[in-house]
């Protein structure tokens, strides 16, 4: 235990400092961007993705009560852990459902209660996991604890890093999966463990189920590894890696067919 603490003391200290900053800014968060409000509604409203769905498709000349708005933003006592509702809501939105499932899961422990804290704590946990993976990635690449801890501090205290944690959107989860894919590929470069291939495929799938823009990052980082494998004449590794990554991407289609309409809609979506 003492050896473990000594080995990771600098990382733990860095995470404690970052945690303090995270909770400081979280406690000072005032109000939410409209997309954050929709994140709650899409996650927690029972088969009613938009506010207008509560009023027969239109709010013109209609009044919404406070309770109706609370019902839209929170999980009800009788519809907790409603993954099917989240899935349906996202087929009517422009994003895949992964992050919304997580928020619905967390919100289901607090039915009828609206607060930013459950989502912020969830984001904080995801953020810490991303930073630990970043540490492990830099250790693999540079074999230097100093470099790894500095990378954690530089990103963990950066404006962009903290913004992903503070904003109740899918971007912090996207960051985690981005670092995870890089880490798994770096592991594969150091050790040819067969178990890494399905993990890479699952990560690609999870990334695409979180945010469609993940495809651009995944394409180029996977292409880079394919080139590396060909240069090393590791043809077996090239085939297995390519199949794993491709399977992860293709699995998006049967898992969330609505992605086709969302990606190729006539109207510009994000």
Q: What does each model-found stretch correspond to?
A:
Residues 88, 92-101, 109-129:
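Loop-to-helix entry region of an early transmembrane alpha helix in multi-pass inner-membrane enzymes
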Residues 166-171:
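Short acidic/glycine- and proline-prone juxtamembrane loop motifs at membrane-interface regions
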């Amino acid at each position: 235990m003492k050896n473990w603490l000594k080995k990771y003391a600098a990382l733990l200290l860095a995470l404690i400092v970052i945690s303090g900053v995270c909770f400081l800014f979280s406690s000072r968060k005032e109000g939410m961007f409209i997309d954050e409000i929709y994140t709650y509604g899409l996650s927690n409203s029972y088969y009613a993705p938009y506010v207008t769905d509560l009023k027969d498709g239109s709010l013109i000349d209609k009044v919404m009560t406070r309770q109706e708005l609370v019902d839209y933003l929170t999980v009800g006592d009788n519809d907790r852990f409603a993954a099917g509702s989240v899935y349906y809501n996202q087929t009517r939105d422009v994003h895949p459902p992964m992050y919304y499932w997580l928020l619905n899961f967390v919100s289901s422990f607090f039915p009828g209660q609206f607060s930013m804290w459950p989502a912020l704590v969830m984001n904080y946990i995801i953020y810490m996991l991303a930073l630990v993976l970043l540490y492990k990635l830099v250790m693999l690449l540079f074999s230097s604890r100093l470099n790894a801890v500095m990378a954690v501090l530089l990103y963990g205290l950066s404006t962009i890093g903290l913004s992903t944690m503070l904003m109740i959107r899918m971007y912090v989860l996207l960051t985690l999966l981005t670092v995870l894919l890089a880490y798994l590929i770096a592991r594969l470069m150091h050790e040819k463990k067969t178990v890494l291939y399905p993990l890479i495929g699952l990560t690609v799938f999870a990334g695409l189920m979180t945010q469609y823009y993940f495809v651009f990052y995944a394409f180029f980082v996977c292409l880079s590894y394919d080139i590396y494998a060909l240069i090393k004449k590791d043809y077996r590794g090239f085939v297995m890696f390519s199949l794993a990554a491709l399977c992860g991407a293709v699995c998006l289609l049967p898992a969330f067919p609505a992605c086709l309409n969302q990606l190729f809609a006539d109207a510009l979506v994000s």
